[in-house]
Amino acid sequence: MINFGMDIQILLSIIHKFYKIIFTPVNLSLFFCFLVLYMIYSYVKDKKSKRYFDYRVNLYIVIGFWTRFGIRFGIRFLIFILKYIFYFIFDILCYIYWFIFSIFLSLIFNIFIYVKIILLYIVFN
């Protein structure tokens, strides 16, 4: 028989791992750190340039911030994010593989049990 409780537990662990990867304290603190730095930097730039609600200024600020301060750190941060995305996809593929493999094994064992029951029925009757 297929164990549906185990499959639900596997799905819950996938969801838990997904939330653990995204909402780690390191990722949240980095996000808020970048957000605060961007807000301070954009406020100073907008104050100097007297152009307040222009999206191009904010775009230039982001590009300038990444090119001045963050090329090395930006590449490391992208590798960090891509690594966790790869780990997440690999975990999902492993869980799908084990889900299919467990169904396949349970079917094989059930077939063996049914064959054994049929043979015992034939032998003793």
Swiss-Prot record:
The organism's taxonomic lineage, starting at the top: Eukaryota, Discoba, Euglenozoa, Euglenida, Spirocuta
Keywords annotated in UniProt: Plastid
Domain of life per record: Eukaryota
UniProt main location, coarse: plastid
Stated name of the protein: Uncharacterized 15.6 kDa protein in rps12-trnP intergenic region
Keyword set includes Plastid: yes
GO cellular component, one term: plastid
Cellular location(s): Plastid
